Regions:
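Internal catalytic-core helix/loop-beta-alpha segment
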Residues: 84-133
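Active-site acidic carboxylates
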Residues: 1-97, 101
Length: 137
């Protein structure tokens, strides 16, 4: 059974589309991942849906990241996704526009360390369309 999405009550959440993540993920170009997400963003913009870009980046001293998570421990060792560095920037092909929110998370779940929940309430959203490189976490 197909479910209709009401664009007035839906938001698009592109996750973790930062330069360091893209450089570390094989097959991006071959699978046309960024091109497909860019098309999805344009469709959402055409429907005037809220678009909330979620990034994952931390301080250079890593004091704001969880130490108990294996994924984040690996990040610390890699010296990547540091706030203010080119690697933490969203790729230009899927970059936010000035009227779109960018919310940075410092843990795997964007609801735990951000104001994402409040933003969705503010937009009166009841449906999320999630896309990105690592959406299985």
């Amino acid at each position: 059974m197909a479910h209709a999405i009401d664009p007035k009550r839906a938001a698009l959440l592109p996750l973790d589309l930062q330069q360091d993540n893209i450089a570390g993920t094989p097959g991006i170009a071959e699978k046309k991942i960024l091109a497909n997400i860019a098309r999805l963003l344009e469709a959402g913009r055409g429907k005037r849906m809220p678009i909330i870009h979620i990034t994952a980046s931390v301080r250079a001293d890593y004091l704001d990241m969880p130490r108990s998570n294996e994924l984040w421990r690996a990040l610390r060792a890699s010296k990547k996704l540091i706030l203010g560095t080119p690697g933490a920037e969203i790729h230009p092909l899927v970059a936010p526009r000035s009227d779109e929110l960018v919310i940075n998370k410092t843990c795997v779940d964007p609801f735990l360390s951000t104001n994402l929940g409040q933003a969705l309430i503010n937009f009166d959203v009841n449906t999320l369309i999630v896309c990105g490189l690592w959406t299985n976490y």
